[in-house]
Each structure stands twice: as structure tokens, then as C-alpha cells.
Amino acid sequence: MQSHETNAMAVAQFLEGHPKVNKVLYPGLASHPHHDLAKKQMDNFSGMLSFQIDKGAELAQKMMSELEIIHYAVSLGHHRSLICWMGTDDLMASSYGLSGDALAAYRDFAGDGVYRLSVGLEDPDDLCEDLAQVLG
């Protein structure tokens, strides 16, 4: 797990500094809304992060075909890095128990959707380069 967590921090910091990335959610980043709580509750911060960009759905198609190291797959936890796009409209279509206010709050938070990235054991510099070549 330590390698997952170290790699995830490096990738989260890379994404947070990328001009096309609007938001990165990783509890290890000081910018995370619950970073202080996470520091109290966790020894480390996991290998899972989310990020948001404009036109995320369009980029999802490009990621499926152009990522070379990170695999486009819907799964959690693996020795390989995995990424998937979670579109807000798709999520809302299956969120029957949420009120209108809750759905509006989620859309405000997520925009048109977020990427979920499960960071694996690959070299974090290679992962950042892989993301950079797709993000442009």
C-alpha cells in the first residue's frame, strides 16, 4: 500500500498543477476540503483520487485510445493504474433516492463528471507523463 500511496500523492500533485485540471480530490493534498481530518484519521492517504477537467466526456474517448500505461477500466485496486470517467448525467439517472437539492449540489461539485484514478505500482513519473500526453 505504501507504494500506491506514494505514487498517488505524486500523481495528485502533478494533476493539481496541470492547467487543464480544474479540481483534484485526494485527501493527502492540502487543498482537499477534509485534509486536516484525514491527517488525524489516516496514517497515509490511499491510492485513489478523482479529478475534473472541462469537457471530460470528450477526453474520456481520447484516454481510452491513447493512454499507454494507465488502463481505462471500471475497477478498484490493482497493481496496475486504472482510470474511468464517471459522468454526472449517468450518475444522476441512477440516483433515485437523492433529492433535487442533493442532485444540484452534486452537479455543482462534479460539473459534467469526474475521473476516478486508482494509482498502481508503476513509476509515478511514467504515470504523470502518460496523463500529460493525453491532457496536452
Which residues are covered by each model-predicted region?
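Short amphipathic alpha-helical segments with heptad-repeat character
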Residues: 1-5, 9, 118
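PLP-dependent enzyme catalytic core of the Aspartate aminotransferase-like
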Residues: 65, 81-136
